[in-house]
Amino acid sequence: MANDWKKTARGQALEVLEEVFQEGAYSNIALNAHLSKSHLTDKDKALVTEIVYGTVARKITLEWILAHVIEDRDKLEAWVYDLLLLSLYQLAYLDKIPAHAVVNDAVSIAKNRGNKKGAEKLVNAVLRKLSSQPLPDPSKIKRVNKRYSVQYSLPVWLVKKLIDQYGEDRALAIFQSLFVRNKASVRVTDVSRMEEIADATGAERSELSPVGLVKSSGYFAGTEYFKEGLLTIQDETSQLVAPTLGIQGEEEILDACAAPGGKTVHMASYLTSGHVTALDLYDHKLDLIKENAQRLGLADKVKTQKLDASQVHRVFPADSFDKILVDAPCSGIGLIRRKPDIKYNKDLQDFASLKAVQLDILSSVCQTLRKGGIITYSTCTIIAEENQEVIQAFLETHPDFEQVALDHPCQNIMVNGCLAITPEQYLTDGFFIAQLRKKA
């Protein structure tokens, strides 16, 4: 039947990639939506996942290779080009899959999907050519930024940006780390059971977080420990945020940009009589925070409110809060390993506009902080304009605040009193944490 191709692993991967590349969908959301309705075996679902994430992550590299065998990309229908991309990904990077299986499946999809004989013939010719000879080698590209862009599938502007900020050697280490498979990580809510849970789940202690467990593969959320609220899904770097606030138990705390609530409930776990007021712009995200707090038995410690964080000073009076967390909206460049779409959806101009938003939020929330109170500022980006430069700009315009130097046992993540973690150091998300105090 003509639509049988949609029931195959590669056919479903094609449908997901069309949504991502042609409609701007997020790969994780589009993939989960398809797999939740799919009747594929677990093995085939794993193949779909590998093809989708791999093709998105390697898109620039794959396009460069295809340009050597396709004279005019614009003459191809978009779905044909996407089919070639996902097939080339398998030929180039999945060495356990026979080339003939990749080619035959792609030709079958083209035959059943297309209205014209030409698509089938073109797909067959291009893939047979690519599978019968060595692929072009991007290491031969002479211009450094272009070479790294093609080798590591990053936009040229981002390659240049990271080299300018970190130097070529460290930037290269960052580029290479983005293709190391992401670890699963959780925060343990009862530290006294850390060893027991680690042994039972086959996990290891986190190098960065004293309450974190990690493992290279597996599914923490399916365990009884998760269901009992002893584990919560949270990246190692994110686990470092709440402890910086030094919560004693009775404080009133503001989480200005709270969803999905991982840091909210982490802060709430330290409270006795105090509360965390968690803000977000969207009801469905506030619902996530409530669900998270409920699962961990912290619902009485968490209040939620629908509010733009840049308008906090208009709603809450001065001296409302002892401590504030601004986990600021950012470019998310530190998340590229887990969310490869990010690198294609940003550009150089974004950093200035994001910096303005981040400063607006800080300038608003600081008006509701009591004297002697602290603000922890965090992001999941490794770009200085969103991190160190935001802190510097805030201090220049707010003389009633000072920076508080943070500390951590891993001294290689400490930069001028801030925690500045890049993805290659511990194979985590890139992350930044700084702290400010309102002078008494």
Set out the residue ranges of the language-model regions.
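S-adenosylmethionine
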Residues: 1-440
